[in-house]
Structures are given as C-alpha cells and as structure tokens.
Amino acid sequence: MLSPANGEQIHLVNYVEDYLDSIESLPFDLQRNVSLMREIDAKYQEILKELDDYYEKFKRETDGTQKRRVLHCIQRALIRSQELGDEKIQIVSQMVELVENRSRQVDSHVELFEAHQDISDGTGGSGKAGQDKSKSEAITQADKPNNKRSRRQRNNENRENASNNHDHDDITSGTPKEKKAKTSKKKKRSKAKAEREASPADLPIDPNEPTYCLCNQVSYGEMIGCDNDECPIEWFHFSCVGLNHKPKGKWYCPKCRGESEKTMDKALEKSKKERAYNR
C-alpha cells in the first residue's frame, strides 16, 4: 500500500502525462491550418494580379463585346476571391474549435486531479485522527533525522522512482505488492488513455457544436482533413479511418477515394474538373 505522500505523487505524474497527451499535438494541428491559410493567401495574391490585368484591359478595350467578356472575367475572379475568404474563415473556426476542445480536456483532467487530491486529503486526515497520541509522543529524537533524510531522498528521485517509493510504514508490505501496484497503475493509465482517444463522452459537449467524420461526432482527439476540395465531410478522426499517424503527402477519405487509396471517386473528380473549367 502506498503512503499518502507517494499517492499524491502518482496522481501528479498521471495528471502531467494526461496534460501532455492533450496538448503535445496541438502545435502541429495549428501549424497545418496556418500552412493552409498561407496557401490561400498565395492564391488570393494571384487573383489580385489577374484583376489588375483585367482592369487595365477593360480600360483599353473599345469594343463593347470584348468589354463584356472582360467584365465577366472580373466577376469570376471576384467570386473566386470571396470563396478563398470563406475558406480562411472556416479554417480559423476549426482552429478555435480545436483549441476549445483541448482546453475542455485539460479542464477535465484538472477536475479529476483535484478529486484525487480531495480523496487523498480525506484519507490522510482520518488516519491522523485515528492514531494513538501516545505513539506520536513516543517518537525519539533519533528517528526524526531519519524521516527528514527519507523525505530528501524521495524529492531527489526521478518520476519513475517516485511512484515506487514507500515510507517507513510501507517497508513491511513486501516486493510482490510493490510490483502489483506498479502493474495496476500502468493498466489503469493505459485504459484511461484509450477511453479518452476512443470517445469524448467524458467531456461536456456543446449541443450547437458541429459534427464531423463518418461517425457524425464532434471534434476530439487526433483528426485529419481530406485533401479533396469537394469533400462533404472534410475532417475525420484517426480511429474512424484506421490511422495511427498522419500520412505523408495528400490523403483522401474513404468516400472520396472510392476503391483506390490514392485516387478520388470518379464523380467527385469530374465535378472538380468541371468547376476548374468554369473558372
């Protein structure tokens, strides 16, 4: 059995690991969205150059028919620029949702950590109340330096040793119990991490929050975006599409790629070509 002090250290270690799991991938996700916004900005600059050329051509043109054609080109360029602006707004909204979701996860971990602390404090208080007063008065002066030295040694131990250290009362528990406690702790931590990645059920869900993926659920955990501009879903959970990490190059969702892993569905490909031709 672990002492209250070591129990608090274990809960602290678990909290730090949960915290790192929640935020360690956040910079990469945000960087991907920022890169998409830069690509949109580059396309927008190209459209501005086209508009300048069309405007100069419109001023020089004297034929009415040619002027109408140039004016039509200007209108299409303006529509494309508006579409790019809408895409940027959508990306920013996704970034805000991503940060809010990770913030809720961190808040949930904080609540769990505080709950463990409250339980530990209550258990420690009951144990102190039940101690015999005569035993506390019978502690000799020679025992006190040993207790202080033990505390200093525990503070100097690394995170793994901190979870296995025992105080003077726990030495009689034996090596098998220490191994059992360590194995049980690892199993509980792995189970909790798997549950967090599998479902966001333990987090408060906003009823107005948009849904994504094939499962039609809110954004949580690791997600990947489909590189098909015509994709109706756009974002997918890693677990729902069988991914463990982000693949290199372009990635298309099961609905868009059809039977092939590297090509999009023929209907969507045709729609994309028609849209490019109309532009």
UniProtKB/Swiss-Prot annotation:
Cellular location(s): Nucleus
Keyword Iron-sulfur: no
Superkingdom to which the source organism belongs: Eukaryota
Ubl conjugation recorded as keyword: yes
Region (Disordered): 115-206
Cited CDD domains: ING_ING1, PHD_ING1_2
Expression by tissue: In the adult, widely expressed with highest levels in thymus and testis.
Record-listed cross-link Glycyl lysine isopeptide (Lys-Gly) (interchain with G-Cter in SUMO2), residues: 135
Signal peptide: none
GO molecular function, one term: zinc ion binding
Positions contributing to Zn(2+) 1 binding: 213, 215, 237, 240
Biased composition (Basic and acidic residues): 154-171
Keyword terms of this UniProt record: Cell cycle, Isopeptide bond, Metal-binding, Nucleus, Tumor suppressor, Ubl conjugation, Zinc, Zinc-finger
Main localization category: nucleus
InterPro entries: ING1_PHD_Znf, ING_fam, ING_N_histone-binding, Zinc_finger_PHD-type_CS, Znf_FYVE_PHD, Znf_PHD, Znf_PHD-finger, Znf_RING/FYVE/PHD
Site (described: Histone H3K4me3 binding): 212, 223, 227, 235
One BP annotation, GO: protein import into nucleus
Biased composition (Basic residues): 179-191
Chain positions covered by the region annotation PBR: 262-279
SUPFAM superfamilies: FYVE/PHD zinc finger (SSF57903)
Binding site for Zn(2+) 2: 226, 231, 253, 256
ZnF locations on chain (PHD-type): 210-259
Entry's Gene Ontology cellular component terms: nucleus; Sin3-type complex
Function recorded in the entry: Isoform 1 inhibits p53-dependent transcriptional activation and may function as an oncoprotein. Isoform 2 acts as a negative growth regulator by cooperating with p53 in transcriptional activation of p53-responsive genes and may act as a tumor suppressor.
PANTHER family: INHIBITOR OF GROWTH PROTEIN, INHIBITOR OF GROWTH PROTEIN 1
Protein name: Inhibitor of growth protein 1
Gene for this chain: Ing1
